[in-house]
A protein has these predicted regions:
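Conserved S/T- and glycine-rich ATP-binding loop of Class I adenylate-forming
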Residues: 24, 30, 65, 73, ...
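Conserved AMP-binding/adenylation subdomain of ANL enzymes
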Residues: 4-23, 33-71, 86
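Short, hinge-like loop/turn segments at secondary-structure boundaries
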Residues: 68-70, 91-93, 141-145, 283
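AMP-binding/adenylate-forming catalytic core of the ANL superfamily
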Residues: 66, 73, 195, 200-201, ...
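Acidic/polar alpha-helix N-cap and adjacent early helical turns
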Residues: 335-346
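Conserved helix-loop-beta element of the AMP-binding
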Residues: 3, 22-25, 50, 71-75, ...
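Conserved AMP-binding/adenylate-forming
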Residues: 47, 100, 107-126, 130-230, ...
């Protein structure tokens, strides 16, 4: 029942807007919430489904999109990063690709702009998790947004959008679990969700996974505006608390990846004797890039408050990823979390 309801919700115009005229490529493994539930939606509406197999590199995906005339594709940002590099290398304009759905982690603004300006492809930002089967929200603009400029629309598209009919979301005060916060777009708190395809309990466990009043706490920190658009600030476990003030790792990563000489970046908390935690950036340079630590740190200077600017940039050859393409920040914290303490002793 829950899968059928979610499939109906996912196919709606304000969701994926899928029909029998579409050709869909989910670049998401079947072990990850059944490829985000897309095979069920495709079967329901008669959409052609193209499965990528083991070839998840940019060149293979570019060839698949061009050969099968894919109209909509889904994946995490690291997948699209490889696709954009490959499409540019082979001079493909991806002419049939009209919509790409990005979830799993926040889409960098520069990536969304590239899809829009270079490939005339609409990016649909989405949010969900295994416990939400996974559909939690999708970003489709409202009619009142039509009059906005492209850059103003982009700022709205960078949010995770609105929940479809069938689920509800709310935010609660971070320190006091069930104190509901206003939907003013500014007040942040714990993102909680409930609905027809949301978890009740984990497999093999008798106790409920929900709060006393029936909501599932997602572990995300977010704001919700008056139109219901969710804007994820961070995973609660990835927030950086420096001197009692919160710093969003997502915001720092988006800034770093907006630099043309950076291919990938992760922001993590490093232990600091005075401030408890300070942000540092772990980054991979773009091909043939000669960027320095000082150059990247200066890039932050006019974009955020001075106290939010990372203390260090550490360049690496690779960043560990999960099987679904998400950065393994736990591993990065274990490897680099003491780097500021080490620099004090040297």
């Amino acid at each position: 029942r829950s899968t059928v309801l979610q499939s109906y919700a996912g196919a709606m115009p304000d969701s994926l807007n899928l029909s029998a005229r579409d050709i869909m490529l989910p670049v998401v493994p079947m072990f990850h919430v059944n490829a985000w539930g897309t095979p069920y939606i495709a079967a329901m509406v008669g959409c052609t489904l193209v499965l990528p197999g083991p070839g998840l590199d940019g060149a293979s995906l570019t060839a698949l999109i061009d050969e099968y005339k894919v109209t909509i594709a889904l994946g995490v940002p690291t997948i699209w990063q490889g696709l954009l590099l490959a499409a540019k290398a082979v001079n493909s304009s991806l002419p049939t690709l009209k919509r790409n759905v990005i979830g799993g982690s926040a889409c960098p603004p520069a990536m969304m702009k590239t899809f829009r300006d270079v490939y005339d492809c609409e990016t649909i930002h989405a949010w969900g998790m295994t416990e939400t089967s996974p559909l939690g929200s999708l970003n489709q603009l409202k009619s009142k947004h039509n009059a906005l400029s492209d850059d103003e629309k982009l700022q709205i598209r960078l949010s995770q959008g609105r929940p479809p009919f069938g689920v509800e979301v709310r935010i609660t005060e971070q320190e006091k679990g069930m104190v509901e916060q206003p939907n003013d777009g500014n007040t942040s708190g714990n993102l909680q969700i409930r609905g027809h395809w949301i978890i009740n309990a984990y497999y093999g466990k008798n106790e409920s996974a929900l709060t006393e009043d029936g909501w599932f706490d997602t572990g995300d920190i977010a704001t919700i505006d008056a139109d219901g658009f969710i804007n994820l600030q961070d995973r609660a476990k990835d927030l950086i608390k420096s001197g009692g003030e919160w710093i969003s790792s997502v915001e720092l990563e988006n800034i770093a990846m907006g630099h043309p000489k950076i291919a990938m970046a992760a922001a993590i908390a490093a232990i600091h004797r005075k401030w408890d935690e300070r942000p540092i950036i772990i980054a991979i340079k773009a091909q043939d890039s000669d960027i320095t630590e000082a150059e990247l740190l200066h890039y932050f200077s006019d974009k955020i408050a001075k106290w939010q600017i990372p203390d260090r940039v550490i360049f690496v050859d690779s960043i560990p990823l999960t099987g679904t393409g998400k950065m393994l920040k736990k591993d990065l914290r274990e490897q680099f979390g003491s780097v500021l303490l080490e620099s004090e002793t040297n």
